[in-house]
């Protein structure tokens, strides 16, 4: 299993990149969102990867964060959602947006992804809604890849010919996991807590953990 590829960006296609790792080129399929965040050709890049195996084809799919990779895996468990459809959803919404849409039952947002029809979008929401809280709670430990040191130059090459490897710019740190943990400690059910936190995050994208908890508690409070 190839879980990470780090090297030099050699080529950019419409839906994939070619990463040179010590002279071996890896074709990695990425979402539109990830492709837009790629550095220039000849610069270093690192992606978490998922190897998708079919009868006559092996394909690598790349992600800037581990949480996005895990969401891709989960999306592919839904009948009718293949690897590229999963990438389309993540490309349109991002990992946090996907989590929020599924948790809130917002099939319309899922349907906004290219190639995703209303039936598939509804199926994604229905099948994954109960699984979303556990994955959302992973958010704190699945940050984007940090810059890494370049590999040692091969014999006969100059050290200056290899640039520092780095990941695409990471998204804003998520406070979702900490808010979910706090609500769980207060005795709220995971599904209820996830829905409240997702709604709070959607209404206040820049909210920190404390603000998310306060907003979620208001949403969870009994209606008079």
Swiss-Prot record:
Pfam families referenced in this protein's UniProt entry, alphabetically: HHH_5 (PF14520), RuvA_C (PF07499), RuvA_N (PF01330)
Q: Where is this region: Domain III?
A: 171-224
Where do the segments described as Domain II lie?
65-143
Positions of the region Domain I?
1-64
Where does this one sit in the cell? Cytoplasm
Its GO CC terms are:
cytoplasm; Holliday junction helicase complex; Holliday junction resolvase complex
**Family annotation (InterPro entries):** DNA_helicase_Holl-junc_RuvA_I, Hlx-hairpin-Hlx_DNA-bd_motif, NA-bd_OB-fold, RuvA, RuvA_2-like, RuvA_C, RuvA_C_sf
Q: Name one GO molecular function term.
A: ATP binding
Which protein, by its recorded name, is this?
Answer: Holliday junction branch migration complex subunit RuvA
State the organism named in the record. Cereibacter sphaeroides (strain ATCC 17023 / DSM 158 / JCM 6121 / CCUG 31486 / LMG 2827 / NBRC 12203 / NCIMB 8253 / ATH 2.4.1.) (Rhodobacter sphaeroides)
């Amino acid at each position: 299993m190839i879980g990470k590829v780090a090297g030099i960006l050699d080529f950019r296609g419409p839906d994939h990149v070619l990463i040179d790792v010590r002279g071996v080129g890896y074709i990695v399929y990425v979402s539109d969102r990830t492709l837009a965040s790629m550095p220039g050709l000849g610069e270093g890049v690192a992606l978490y990867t998922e190897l998708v195996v079919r009868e006559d084809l092996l394909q690598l799919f790349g992600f800037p964060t581990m949480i996005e990779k895990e969401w891709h895996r989960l999306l592919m468990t839904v009948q009718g959602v293949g690897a590229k459809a999963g990438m389309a959803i993540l490309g349109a919404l991002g990992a946090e947006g996907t989590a929020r849409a599924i948790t809130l039952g917002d099939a319309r947002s899922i349907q906004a992804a290219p190639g995703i029809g209303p039936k598939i979008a509804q199926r994604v929401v229905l099948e994954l809604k109960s699984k979303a809280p556990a994955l959302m709670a992973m958010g704190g430990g699945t940050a984007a890849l940090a810059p890494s040191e370049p590999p040692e130059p091969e014999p006969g090459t100059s050290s200056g010919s290899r640039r520092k490897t780095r990941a695409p710019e990471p998204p804003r740190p998520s406070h979702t996991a900490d808010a979910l943990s706090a609500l769980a400690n207060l005795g709220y059910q995971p599904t209820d807590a996830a829905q409240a936190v997702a709604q709070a995050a959607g209404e206040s994208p820049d909210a920190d953990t404390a603000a998310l908890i306060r907003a979620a508690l208001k949403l969870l409070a009994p209606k008079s």
